């Protein structure tokens, strides 16, 4: 299949990584994958996919159901190849209204997790509904995830009060600070560690690393975290 190289890569990494380094598999969540399938590219307003989702929810739901099935298979094969945890990225979750977020983001993730846990009951699963604000709390309480990855706009004190009692939180350095480096980056790293480090926490960026990030800044980040 076209994704066979993914499983091969996961398997090779699993063989080479030391025992104290976890290998995390990942997939796009159904809503976000659907946005790219329908729009054909990234979109500022997601007008085309929203027209379908809001105007013909039964028809759009059939696409989401197909993506749920495909995602369960995709993540399951990554686990079989050696992934020790998985993460679902819903990059465009924040584009939806509250009710649409429930229907097109939370419910499909719930279905994926239910099906994965039949075969992998102890598999750690992280969700990333980027940009949903207070919706992170609903997601953490209802989606069935073990961890929630946070974008860089989420207030840290709110995270401690509203999320860390329910799930492990992951995040949330602004990727642009990793590009900039220096004192600004290091101050924010320390603030995140000091605020979130008292509870269940995985340090990470608040979204993906950007191409122009200097490798030495990544090295400095790793040095701080290991120190």
Set out the residue ranges of the language-model regions.
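Active-site loop segments of alpha/beta catalytic cores
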Residues: 2-227
């Amino acid at each position: 299949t076209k994704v066979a190289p993914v499983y091969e890569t996961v398997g090779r990494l699993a063989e080479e990584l030391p025992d104290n380094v976890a290998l995390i598999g990942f997939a796009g969540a159904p809503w976000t994958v659907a946005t790219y399938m329908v729009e054909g590219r990234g979109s500022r307003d997601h007008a085309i996919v929203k027209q379908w989702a809001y105007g013909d929810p039964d028809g759009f739901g059939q696409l989401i159901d197909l993506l749920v099935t495909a995602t369960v298979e995709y993540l399951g094969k990554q686990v079989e190849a050696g992934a020790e945890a998985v993460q679902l990225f819903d990059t465009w979750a924040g584009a939806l209204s509250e009710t649409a977020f429930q229907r097109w983001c939370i419910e499909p993730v719930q279905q994926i997790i239910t099906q994965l846990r039949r075969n992998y009951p102890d598999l750690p699963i992280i969700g990333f509904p980027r940009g949903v604000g207070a919706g992170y709390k609903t997601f953490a309480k209802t989606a069935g995830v073990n961890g929630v990855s946070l974008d860089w706009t989420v207030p840290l004190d709110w995270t401690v009060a509203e999320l860390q009692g329910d799930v492990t939180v992951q995040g949330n350095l602004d990727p642009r600070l990793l590009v900039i480096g220096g004192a600004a980056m290091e101050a924010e790293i320390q603030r995140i560690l000091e605020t979130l480090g008292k509870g269940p926490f995985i340090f990470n960026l608040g979204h993906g690393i950007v191409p122009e990030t200097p490798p030495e800044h990544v090295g400095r980040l790793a040095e701080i975290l290991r120190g």
